[in-house]
């Protein structure tokens, strides 16, 4: 049932975050919902391993973005992966989150250093689907709420409305319009209506998907990131040092790259 996201033995036994998708009959809307407590624990464990600590307000923004990209991904085809970069002016920072439906993974990071204020807030979405060209769209948005930013992205880029609601402390619901959606109903929903939605509307469970916190970054992937620069300017990359230390741009994990190993990788390509 909609009112309990953890009401099955399967949800307790299988690893990873469970996201349930429902079709709202008669309204033509797709609803995805999950409790993100488990994913947030994995995020904090990852930060602890890195020795990183963000301001609580910044953490909340990234947690919102992680919830948003996961619920969005669960509403998209299985063959699709998505990455969002969200530039905020106040506080001045960049959020990066990504979800891969094929692998069932979610990752994210926030950046506060060397972030320039260019006078606008920007939401950049990169979408990759199997056997199709990647697609990028960028929209400007107002305000400092991540969920509202995604809603503005939907209106401007997806050309359809979508709504986020907080059902519990770490329990979020996402509703997106489908063809012939009852737009007046969708746009008129509020928090009180969401609490009784399973009693007032006919919800049909479509599927469940599972997501886990995982980047998949490896030293070989870091080689691929650095290969072009290594070919063009190895001295500028390493200087006189035999070792380069870098952070994964997706999750912040630290990698140590030796010049010898990178040279071998580049020469083998």
List the model feature ranges, each with a label.
Residues 178-269:
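Cys/His-clustered metal-coordination modules, chiefly Zn-binding fingers
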Residues 2-206:
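Interaction interfaces in information-processing and related assembly proteins
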